[in-house]
Amino acid sequence: MTTNGADPLGRFSALTREWFTTAFAAPTPAQADAWSAISEGNNTLVIAPTGSGKTLAAFLWAIDRLADPAREPSQGTQVLYVSPLKALAVDVERNLRTPLTGITRVAERHGLPAPSITVGVRSGDTPPNQRRAMIANPPDVLITTPESLFLMLTSAARETLTSVRTVIVDEVHAVAATKRGAHLALSLERLDQLLDTPAQRIGLSATVRPPEEVARFLSGQAPTTIVCPPAAKTFDLSVQVPVPDMANLDNNSIWPDVEERIVDLVEAHNSSIVFANSRRLAERLTSRLNEIHAERSGIELPAGPNPEVGGGAPAHLMGSGQANGAPPLLARAHHGSVSKEQRAQVEDDLKSGRLRAVVATSSLELGIDMGAVDLVIQVEAPPSVASGLQRVGRAGHQVGEISQGVLFPKHRTDLIGCAVTVQRMQTGDIETLRVPANPLDVLAQHTVAVAALEPVDADAWFDAVRRSAPFATLPRSAFEATLDLLSGKYPSTEFAELRPRLVYDRDTGTLTARPGAQRLAVTSGGAIPDRGMFTVYLASETEKPSRVGELDEEMVYESRPGDVISLGATSWRITEITHDRVLVIPAPGQPARLPFWRGDSVGRPAELGAAVGAFTGELASLDRKAFDKRCQKMGFAGYATDNLHQLLREQREATGVVPSDTTFVVERFRDELGDWRVILHSPYGLRVHGPLALAVGRRLRERYGIDEKPTASDDGIIVRLPDSGDTPPGADLFVFDADEIEPIVTAEVGGSALFASRFRECAARALLLPRRHPGKRSPLWHQRQRAAQLLDIARKYPDFPIVLEAVRECLQDVYDVPALIELMHKIAQRRLRIVEVETATPSPFAASLLFGYVGAFMYEGDSPLAERRAAALALDTVLLSELLGRVELRELLDPAVVASTSAQLQHLTPERAARDAEGVADLLRLLGPLTEADIAQRCTADNIGAWLDGLHAAKRALPVTYAGQTWWAAVEDIGLLRDGIGVPVPVGVPAAFTESASDPLGDLIGRYARTRGPFTTEQTAARFGLGVRVASDVLSRMAVDGRLIRGEFAADLSGEQWCDAQVLKILRRRSLAALRAQVEPVSTDAYARFLPSWQHVGSTNTTGIDGLATVIEQLAGVPIPASAVESLVFPQRVRDYQPAMLDELLASGEVMWSGAGQIGNGDGWVAFHLADTAPLTLTHGAEIEFTDTHRVILETLGHGGAYFFRQLTDGTVEGTAGQELKQALWELIWAGWVTGDTFAPVRAVLSGPRRSGAPAHRQRQRPPRLSRYSVAHAQTRGTDPTVSGRWSALPAAEPDSTVRAHFQAELLLGRHGVLTKGAVGAEGVPGGFATLYKVLSTFEDAGRCQRGYFVESLGGAQFAVASTVDRLRSYLDNVDPERPEYHAVVLAATDPANPYGAALGWPTDSEAHRPGRKAGALVALVDGRLVWFLERGGRSLLSFGADADAQRAAAGALTDLVSAGRIPSLLVERINGVAVLDPDVDAERAVVQDALLGAGLSRTPRGLRLR
């Protein structure tokens, strides 16, 4: 090796130099500087942006050393590469092949010995046999993860690491500031203890600040060379808004426009990554992008699965390239819930060009090579500047390429976050990174691990621990306290249940493991916390609780019984919280908290918050020209600049000042219930606002006696205060002495939800909550329960190490208390001012803070109409307009409420009518002048004239003329009428009533507005004889004063309307009450009315062959008795049904039928299928006792095509009689193996064996031998209708259970409308409701359906499409308003339109035999209620206690079927188990008999008969 300081490659061997110069033009600056430091043996931190060759910079020197022919053979690993991501580890292993293969080829070209360098990967995905192989034959280069390194160091595998010379830590910035990083730091120190000489450490990092902190993390106390060449990375960033006004949207949502624009961008580029900040948003975006792309391309989206998602989702939502036959699609999803295999497939598809786009969360943020990505799209501001750089850096990943990124804000205030992120990305001004200090739980875990294999000297271990950066300042007292914890020296006997893991001999200072310590460390080790969900169940006193959904652990800790939460489309009130579940009851229409899933997100850092505030303050001070120029520099495109300018202008108009880094705003306003909302507007982020909210909560309790939990977010704090009549607090609520704030927060955090969840994680990390079964995760509920029990004890001992650690984690890692203290200092020093304002409605920034309450509107249409309207009315409409665009109240207000309220205000209701002269006087005083006709409408008597004469004589009411009419006016109004509209004062009016008012016309119009519902300018002008312009000016002035509201309120009025502010509140409150009644679950009777109609029963619109095809599509795959198909099921749905229609569909190949089991000798179960989707609705053929005849028939049909029965005799069994062959064929038909191209054979079987020659079930003789040649003589005699037509093999059922489950979920949603556990059970779906629940939950995430409590008594896990729920609720009243009489329908008991015995249980009040969904049985429903159940032929009838009118309606419907020939005859022999002829007739049976006799049945010796 030659050394040349001027040449970066001069230190490498000739082989390596030749390969590099052949493959690359020149080293990058990062590579050149790194090789200089690494070749000197220095610990080195290489900081460079994505695409600068960092990985090769770290590896090439080590590879060159390994390729040296003179090196001594080693029995262990020499290069250890540690990656925070398993996927990144695999990616690096793949990329290492290039230099290894290249150097080998160069050696071979020169005739030199080829270097033999082995590479291995060990992670959680590595099979045990490969792990054992690596222990036996360690690779030269081992690629692993922090967790796998820990396991190797705590097992015999550590011996393979004793020869390590180089450790490379990739993406070091991703772990340095976390406990996972602290865990890795101790692992590296433990590794050094195994080595003769500490290994050289090389860290690879994206841009970080400060570099010295990451270098300290990497090497601890050892010196480190920092390689950080000037960043040559160029970013092309833009912020785009696709609409001109984000506050006035055509679709009430910005998402449709954003989605269309994203598709434009993706289609204009070769390869794109779309980043979203949540998994649910990623799923929905993927769905919509594919749908839009398909619509543009004219592609029909098929149903298929998304196998990479747990439970899956339709292929057209997020399938890749060719997914189960689906056409090429635009995007697939990539996030933590996607399986590792499918994530790899998505990555490979994008790299290879088979996929145009991936929609991802942070799962693609780190350095995985995604190939030639040329565009990154970020939806809403990224979580941090560093995250933004990482994400956009995915585009133009190669050296020297430009990274192009487009950001789409989700609402107006998100524009500010996007702008500041872009600004700081351009300057590289990222957030400060801080290494955690002294995490005692990590220390405890490693202490058990290090002592597990051999005794350890405590002093030596303490020194090793302190060499790592996270523990550099660890006090000996904390170390000893941790050893006490692990060795069983507890502060109280209450901790006796904690099992000591070590023996600590304080005399010798030796730590020795107790039995099981090593197993505990390897089965429960690691720093990544187990975080999970609480299951939510519907509480029931009588039934087993049914599942509703899931909630985030921290949200549960923040909730209490009585709180109302939102899950799916329904609000639920919490009744109980246990260790593993949350019990709820429906709270229809109540304002609810939306669930959150925080995970590891801790909010905006304080320094980024200061930048946001400074930016906002700066922009607010600029004139428009300077403003535009400033925005242009930040890449604002489209309508982004106008929207941001409008937002800041409106905020300044609302509060007088825009919140900034030096100005906080405390805004107060009343909500819809009259309570106060007090909002602190501050940009400093959740890490500052979270601890401040704790202190504010304490102040509310101590000073005001209010137990209210303020809500903190990145942009401020929201406090809700009940109206007590006093002035609500202002800035004083949020200002604390700088010296007292930390003790207050420290005291309060111990009782917070955050502390409870972090304590559990710390206790588990410290091995205090070991897994009961090695290799398996403990159920989280069990871990929570044990953690809660431990916390109950530990709270009493503040010095308990895990209590200290949980508090430290909350105060240092999650919260930023120092930044909060600094803010309090600034306030005290007047460097930060607080402005108090009181507003009538929320300011734009306040609207954004309250955004969580209306988040559901962002995907409008996801929820049923009543839920959307109720939620909207529960909010301030100005808030809705600010966030979502103009929302007209006419879309929300109930027209019936508007009409009834207007009638009340106008005294047009009976209870408000005038009953005497005094009542008339009150009318005139309250409503103003009225004509005599007006008064007559408002009186209960006819002697109005006498009453008016009396009032006139007493000079209490006077006739006046204006607007072309004569009016009666109260004498008190004469002055107003004179001064307001020029009415002359009648003679004799006392002077006291003619005094002038300050605003006479305003008073007149104000009263007019207060006494009616919405009205127009024209109506006002006509009422008072004014010009329209004059009326408009007065109304506008009153609106400015807040007395009137301008908008569109009533559907029967056109154009601009007005409404008194207080009247509008009444209308909203009453409409909300009405809507909440609608939001309540419908009764089971309503569902039973809905389902037949949903399935077209009784429809007059379903006709002809197309109508029949529609019906079959809905009923696809469901078994129905053949006897009911053409007598009841099809004719009741298709108005003009004829058997020829079905035969035509079968003959054309559009539809096919299959058998699903024989019923006796003359009936069987059949199902119908659309040919295109038949494999998804067919079941696998049933197992029968196959004979040679069966096999030959199947073999013949298996060749393809269709065969007449006569043709089937060829190749069958020699000597087989026609009857025997027919018998075998029908057995295959009923078993679901064979089908025909006509339904005629089934009809023939139904008509009976004597006429059709259909096979009877009998014992078969042993079949004769199989013949290999044609046996043409085996023929049937004549033409047998039971085997007419052509026969073919049914296509194979789709073997993939996931594919079937997804299609089945879609199919059952379409069949049942509201899908419940009972409905799925009745269908006999493989895997039952549990299987479909996973699929339906994924549909919900993708916006394909809603989960809610739509039908009472059917459990909380009900799924439906929003529009279906709207239709269901139209059956709330006694259904059909055009058919007020009883509506009866008789169905086959097996008909899918019969909800009883499926979604609904059978009534239990019958003392006779139990009803069931049996072939031949009938049910009679009257307005959805089950009235009768009749066994086949009607011989036994069960009645369920309906009134006489309902019984008569049922009897009429039943006899109509007999008359129409749908059922052949009717003979009722028993009613409720008692013979009809029994003379002892009770009241109920008498009602039934009367109904039947009245419908035309006659008494016979056997019973009641109708022919």
Swiss-Prot record:
Where is the short sequence motif DEAH box located?
Answer: 170-173
Q: What induces it?
A: Induced by treatment with mitomycin C (MMC) (at protein level).
Region CTD, annotated ranges: 857-1507
Q: Where is this region: Domain 4?
A: 530-856
Q: Domain Helicase C-terminal: where?
A: 257-451
Give the start-end ranges of region Lhr-Core.
1-856
Give the family this protein belongs to, as stated in its UniProt record: Belongs to the Lhr helicase family.
Q: What is the lineage of its organism?
A: Bacteria, Bacillati, Actinomycetota, Actinomycetes, Mycobacteriales
Q: Where is this site: Forms salt bridge clamp with R-280?
A: 550
Q: What is this protein called?
A: Lhr helicase/ probable uracil glycosylase
Q: Write one Pfam family the protein is assigned to.
A: Helicase_C
Function, in words: A 3'-5' helicase involved in repair of at least 3 types of DNA cross-links, mitomycin C (MMC), cisplatin, and psoralen-UVA. Translocates 3'-to-5' on single-stranded (ss)DNA, unwinding any encountered duplex nucleic acid. A 3'-ssDNA loading strand of at least 15 nucleotides is required for helicase activity. An RNA:DNA hybrid with a 3'-ssDNA loading strand is an 8-fold better helicase substrate than 3'-tailed double-stranded (ds)DNA; substrates where the helicase loads on a 3'-ssRNA tail (DNA:RNA and RNA:RNA) are not unwound. Excises uracil residues from ssDNA. Uracil residues in DNA can arise as a result of misincorporation of dUMP residues by DNA polymerase or due to deamination of cytosine.
In this chain, the site described as Forms salt bridge clamp with E-550 is at 280
For the site labelled Wedges between bases of the loading strand, the residues are 528
Q: How is the cofactor bound?
A: ssDNA-dependent ATPase is most efficient with Ca(2+); Mn(2+) and Mn(2+) are 60% less effective.
Q: Which residues does the record give as ATP binding sites?
A: 24, 31, 54-55, 170-171, 377, 394, 397
Give the Helicase ATP-binding domain ranges.
35-226
Q: Which UniProt keywords apply?
A: ATP-binding, DNA damage, DNA repair, DNA-binding, Helicase, Hydrolase, Isomerase, Metal-binding, Nucleotide-binding
**Binding site residues for ssDNA:** 122, 131, 145, 148, 152, 253, 255, 279, 410, 518-519, 528, 597, 600, 777
According to its record, what is known about the domains?
Answer: The Lhr-Core is composed of 2 helicase domains, a winged-helix (WH) domain, and Lhr-specific domain 4. It is followed by the C-terminal domain (CTD). A fragment of residues 1-562 has no ssDNA-dependent ATPase or helicase activity. The C-terminus is required for translocation through a DNA:DNA hybrid; a fragment with residues 1-1098 unwinds an RNA:DNA hybrid as well as full-length protein but has only 14% of its activity on a dsDNA. A 13-mer ssDNA binds in an extended conformation across the Lhr-Core surface, contacting the first 4 domains.
Ranges for the region named WH domain are 436-529
Necessary cofactors: Ca(2+)
Organism, as annotated: Mycolicibacterium smegmatis (strain ATCC 700084 / mc(2)155)
Knockout phenotype, as recorded, reads:
Cells are more sensitive to killing by DNA cross-linking agents mitomycin C (MMC) and cisplatin but not UV light or methyl methanesulfonate. Double lhr-uvrD1 deletions are 10-fold more sensitive to MMC and cisplatin than single deletions. Greatly increased sensitivity to trioxsalen (also called trimethlypsoralen it intercalates into DNA and forms interstrand adducts and cross-links after UVA exposure). A double lhr-uvrD1 deletion is even more sensitive to trioxsalen.
